[in-house]
UniProtKB/Swiss-Prot annotation:
Enzyme class, broadest EC rank: hydrolase
Cofactors, names only: Zn(2+)
UniProt record, GO biological process: lipid A biosynthetic process
HAMAP family per UniProt: LpxC
Listed Pfam families: LpxC
Similarity-based family: Belongs to the LpxC family.
Protein residues bound to Zn(2+): 78, 237, 241
One Gene Ontology term of the molecular function aspect: UDP-3-O-acyl-N-acetylglucosamine deacetylase activity
Sorted UniProt keywords: Hydrolase, Lipid A biosynthesis, Lipid biosynthesis, Lipid metabolism, Metal-binding, Zinc
GO cellular component terms, A-Z: membrane
Pathway recorded for this protein: Glycolipid biosynthesis; lipid IV(A) biosynthesis; lipid IV(A) from (3R)-3-hydroxytetradecanoyl-[acyl-carrier-protein] and UDP-N-acetyl-alpha-D-glucosamine: step 2/6
Catalyses which reaction(s): a UDP-3-O-[(3R)-3-hydroxyacyl]-N-acetyl-alpha-D-glucosamine + H2O = a UDP-3-O-[(3R)-3-hydroxyacyl]-alpha-D-glucosamine + acetate
Protein name: UDP-3-O-acyl-N-acetylglucosamine deacetylase
Length: 303
């Protein structure tokens, strides 16, 4: 049987919020079977818990934000991407502020934290959402689509008319049965343009942003001294973001996601469209691990 997974131990980290610039204390804790991923604002009294579910997404400007009443948790997508990539079904995420720390702008530090805490299998079958037929959403020239696929695959295309992007790969497709999330996707950092940063800061966004936690691009070059981690780091980060956004379904996916210029808003719209279309998906478990799509047969850390 493919079993649900949680963390073996509690683990803590400290960082800053990308948009708030505030110091944030993060604690990842094991959670019981069928809990899902739950964000907990421990700076509030009483503590407010917000499950990482598509219906709890309230804002999608620059990041994915979970909302419950007037309480928010910003920038959840990179941590959720790491949880998805390592197959963590159940965990509590305690935060001392309204934003998940940005760390280095990728999912790499979260992967390291989760691997350091250890993975613990639980005595219950892991539930997967299997895509049964195509579901798509569009907005202008942006598009996001789910199609049936026996495994988990994410394809993405960006389209920036900019000197830094023109000579680079702007399309990537990752089949996780043959590609390691940890090695090929998790270290791709978020990126931003110098020309946008002043405006963002005037809107109280990107206050914690720097070359320490993002790829910063000016009119014709990458400003980070060390350059890029992957030749296609820009589009790989969009894949990383999409994996985090898709994990708001609450379960691992069996299917393919295709995005063209999609962002957090369209990704969430696709999830809501899928959830509402009950004939387009089903929940499945695997009593015999040998019958499962290969990408889920062992911890991603070992791939």
């Amino acid at each position: 049987m493919i079993k649900q997974r949680t963390l073996k131990n509690i683990i803590r980290a400290t960082g800053v919020g990308l948009h708030s610039g505030e110091k944030v204390y993060l604690t990842l804790k094991p959670a019981p079977v069928d809990t899902g991923i739950v964000f907990c604002r421990t700076d509030l009294d009483p503590v407010v818990e917000i499950p990482a579910r598509a219906e709890n997404v309230g804002e999608t400007t620059m990041s994915t934000t979970l909302v419950k009443g007037d309480v928010k948790v910003d920038t959840v997508e990179h941590l959720l991407s790491a949880m998805a990539g390592l197959g963590i079904d159940n965990a509590y995420v305690e935060l001392s502020a309204s934003e998940v720390p940005i760390m280095d702008g990728s999912a790499g530090p979260f992967v390291f934290l989760i691997q350091s805490a250890g993975l613990q299998e639980q005595e219950a079958a892991k539930k997967f959402i299997r895509i049964k037929r195509e579901v798509s959403v569009e907005e202008g020239d942006k598009r996001a689509v789910f199609v049936p696929f026996d495994g988990f695959k994410v394809s993405f295309e960006i389209d920036f008319d900019h000197p830094v992007f023109r000579g680079r790969t702007q399309q990537a497709s990752v089949d996780f049965s043959s590609t390691s999330f940890v090695k090929e996707v998790s270290r791709a950092r978020t990126f931003g343009f110098m020309r946008d940063i002043e405006y963002l800061r005037s809107q109280n966004l990107a206050l914690g942003g720097s070359v320490e936690n993002a790829i910063v691009v000016d009119e014709n070059r990458v400003l980070n001294e060390d350059g890029l981690r992957y030749e296609d780091e820009f589009v790989k980060h969009k894949i990383l973001d999409a994996i985090g956004d898709l994990y708001l379904l609450g379960n691992s996916l069996i299917g393919e996601f295709r995005g063209f210029k999609s962002g957090h808003a369209l990704n969430n719209q696709l999830l809501r469209t899928l959830i509402a279309d009950k004939d387009a998906w089903e929940v499945v478990t695997f009593e015999d691990a040998r019958t499962a799509p290969i990408s889920y047969m062992r911890p991603a850390a070992a791939v």
